[in-house]
């Protein structure tokens, strides 16, 4: 199973917020997912990002590939740096 960490759209029209989820890459964007690891709300000022670091690092170690947007969010929160430290 090819696993990705990606954003799942929530909210109403023009008021979107997202959940960071681990999902099979073959499933639809808002379809079934394996585990929820955080959320992202771009409409607040400044944008709100919360990530469960333990879960995110666990999935990255298991080979889950983050999408481009999720990768940038993980960099901002410092999770990607912690993951790279643990790899060395």
From Swiss-Prot:
Residues folding into a coiled coil are: none
One GO MF term: structural constituent of ribosome
* Keywords from the named record: Ribonucleoprotein, Ribosomal protein
What Pfam families does its record include?
A: Ribosomal_S16
Q: What Gene Ontology terms describe where this protein resides (cellular component)?
A: cytoplasm; small ribosomal subunit
* One Gene Ontology biological process: translation
Keyword Glycoprotein part of the UniProt annotation: no
**What family does this chain come from, according to its entry?**
Belongs to the bacterial ribosomal protein bS16 family.
Q: Which HAMAP family match?
A: Ribosomal_bS16
Q: What's the name of the protein?
A: Small ribosomal subunit protein bS16
State the organism of origin.
Halothermothrix orenii (strain H 168 / OCM 544 / DSM 9562)
Gene responsible for this protein = rpsP
